[in-house]
Amino acid sequence: MLKDLYKTQIVPSLQNKLGYSNVMQVPKIVKVCLNMGLGIRGSDSKVMNSCVRDLALIAGQKPVATSVKKSIAGFKIRKGFPIGCKVTLRNNKMYEFLERLIYVVLPREQDFKGLSINQFDGCGNISIGIKEHISFLEVDYDKIDKILGLDINIVTNAVNNKDAKLLLMEFGLPFIN
């Protein structure tokens, strides 16, 4: 499991590579946030229910429905309009999800060559977009109404992008350069 790998191999390795004197200075993954945005399709309760069901299967816990905070006439949306769903994973469920992401989902993703350094936000967090949520084995292809995208945000406590990239490379995430 990735949690055991982190404690036994990744922490000592990163401590040597980054030159930290204390184990607590080594960066770690704090949480993983999953988000499915539906846009205007969120008004259809059938699509919204399937989105919540699929994200619950993928994450292993119940997602929260997100709604519009401010009305925008140009986008034809009103305040309180359902627009997607999200879930935050921590601790054991986070490591289980990362293991499935690294070893199952990313290899199944079409045209995936690796992650780019441009996907980092400057503070050590990375955002990954999955074009088709059917890449996850938990989602039954026969029961889905529509193929949706999925946003994955991996939040670390790393000081900069370089440290976060080293951490994620130790976990096995593939990078282009």
From Swiss-Prot:
One Pfam family recorded for the sequence: Ribosomal_L5_C
An example Gene Ontology CC term for this record: ribonucleoprotein complex
Disulfide pairings: none
InterPro entries for this protein: Ribosomal_uL5, Ribosomal_uL5_bac-type, Ribosomal_uL5_C, Ribosomal_uL5_dom_sf, Ribosomal_uL5_N
Biological process, per Gene Ontology: translation
Domain of life: Bacteria
PANTHER family associated with the record: 60S RIBOSOMAL PROTEIN L11-RELATED (PTHR11994)
Family classification: Belongs to the universal ribosomal protein uL5 family.
Subunit structure as annotated in this protein's UniProt entry: Part of the 50S ribosomal subunit; part of the 5S rRNA/L5/L18/L25 subcomplex. Contacts the 5S rRNA and the P site tRNA. Forms a bridge to the 30S subunit in the 70S ribosome.
Protein name, entry field: Large ribosomal subunit protein uL5
Gene source species: Ehrlichia ruminantium (strain Welgevonden)
Name of the coding gene: rplE
